[in-house]
């Protein structure tokens, strides 16, 4: 017994770090860990409560006063949100010496709603309704905020729970955006939970309702939506074509399914959080003792999902949303790593006016991710012209054998692009890879003769229609679609 007490005393008697005010102390116990964020157990001496001490490595994200100002604006937003269904945000500060940003939030005893649901599989429908009401109250608060706030990455991994009280709260607001105008204009989030209008980068707060519907689907099936898909491009294709996830067919209860379908309706028919709170499905029925039932999902014998969600956080000129690293849990052990897709965005601003004259009204951006095995990258080049034609080009990049210039030349040749685009594309590829691979040197590798290193999408033939076309050109796989005036009208 004394040995056990001594062990606890050594763990908790000394802080390893204290905040500038002296109020919060950090212990060395890791609650969870992502690629850039580590969560430690902390203590609030004023209130006498345990807290979550979140530490984000900034690396090169803070490169200018503008980016720092933007980061502070986000922190200010999080501090101003006060609601019982929103995670409490206590304090934050920048550690310039160690290039960290630290922020303190409330700590949840049971981790995320997804973890909690996988742990407790036998749940009455009343519990699910209770969770839904709490989440919708939080969304209604965000959406009626002045200005309205869109979460943009709502999923069960970002909803936290204190299981001993049944208290559910929305967290991880790093992708949240204040809606200063009628629409937002960045494609961010997790593909399985993203509404069709998000892919067209013009949307409002109703995208959170769509994501909420997918959360309810996940609650009752244990699966991520679109678990039948193997990568984001397949999900994208199904979403923009209006095809619902196969998991919806597993929902046996017609009342539950009907409620989910209301959330997943087209934006013109989709209800607000306030309207959904008045829905008959969420009415309290003391006599309703049904268990949540669905066909068996993609879960192994240990209760672990067989596929993790993908994630598309938004970066802009090096700015990093501080809550982005979502895949961690309060377990004190090694965190289960998810198959996240970390996408970054690089925009080359040199000689912007001269480039605009040559490229006209074409907007070009590039994003990338590391491959799961760590020995290569996947990149996506996106172009949008003044007519609203969007062209997404996916391709692998081998950091050992490829160079930016060789791949750019190959792309221009395979896709019959303007030869003058080679240098611009190569520069953008180099810039993006430099942000993904810290030791990357521009033009450091010999030119590659490889035509294909892997595949992003499995298309057996070209398929064209109203929602887009897909083609394969060597290593390059292309999706194109048009944003028309009629499309925009439908989503208003």
Curated annotation (Swiss-Prot):
Catalytic activity line of the entry: L-seryl-[protein] + ATP = O-phospho-L-seryl-[protein] + ADP + H(+); L-threonyl-[protein] + ATP = O-phospho-L-threonyl-[protein] + ADP + H(+)
Enzyme kind, highest EC tier: transferase
EC number(s) stated in the UniProt entry for this protein: 2.7.11.1
Listed SMART domains: S_TKc (SM00220)
Keywords: ATP-binding, Kinase, Nucleotide-binding, Serine/threonine-protein kinase, Transferase
Gene3D superfamilies: Phosphatidylinositol 3-kinase Catalytic Subunit, Chain A, domain 1, Phosphorylase Kinase, domain 1, Transferase(Phosphotransferase) domain 1
One GO MF term attached to the UniProt entry: protein serine kinase activity
Pfam annotation, one family: OSR1_C
Record-level GO BP terms: protein phosphorylation
InterPro entries: Kinase-like_dom_sf, Kinase_OSR1/WNK_CCT, Prot_kinase_dom, Ser/Thr_kinase_AS, WNK_Ser-Thr_kinase
Active site (record annotation): 172 (proton acceptor)
UniProt-annotated binding residues for ATP: 105-108, 155
Domain Protein kinase: 25-282
Family, as annotated: Belongs to the protein kinase superfamily. Ser/Thr protein kinase family. WNK subfamily.
Stated role: May regulate flowering time by modulating the photoperiod pathway.
Protein name (record): Probable serine/threonine-protein kinase WNK9
Source taxonomy: Eukaryota, Viridiplantae, Streptophyta, Embryophyta, Tracheophyta
